[in-house]
């Protein structure tokens, strides 16, 4: 019976991680879009139109968004690994429970 509770607990954790992974992937997409936007802005901004400081600011913003994308990609990999570990544990617990009930 303890295995049943553990299986339920692990399944809930797995589902929570799945939702977190989806949320993280959305953040990756959003930040990648921002990077593209800023790249396009850099194509249109000209020193004669604005000051060189504006270009520097936009470049810094672009770098910040790229760093965020990298951070979210790393976080997604960590979450995926946790989900795989939980799936493996659920499978092992289920098999052990089946053997114990035979």
Swiss-Prot record:
Belongs to the pole-localizer TmaR family. It comes from Aliivibrio salmonicida (strain LFI1238) (Vibrio salmonicida (strain LFI1238)). Transmembrane segments: none annotated. NCBIfam families: PRK05423.1. The gene is tmaR. The keyword DNA repair does not apply. It is found in: Cytoplasm. This is Pole-localizer protein TmaR. Residues 7-34 form a coiled coil. Its main location: cytoplasm.
């Amino acid at each position: 019976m303890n295995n049943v509770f553990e299986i339920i607990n692990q399944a809930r954790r797995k589902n929570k991680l799945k939702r977190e992974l989806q949320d993280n992937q959305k953040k990756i997409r959003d930040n990648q879009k921002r990077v593209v936007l800023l790249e396009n802005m850099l194509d249109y901004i000209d020193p004669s139109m604005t000051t060189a400081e504006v270009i520097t600011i936009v470049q810094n913003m672009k770098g910040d968004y790229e760093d965020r994308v990298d951070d979210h990609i790393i976080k997604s990999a960590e979450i995926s690994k946790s989900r795989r570990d939980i799936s493996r544990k659920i499978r092992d617990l289920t098999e052990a429970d089946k053997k114990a009930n035979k």
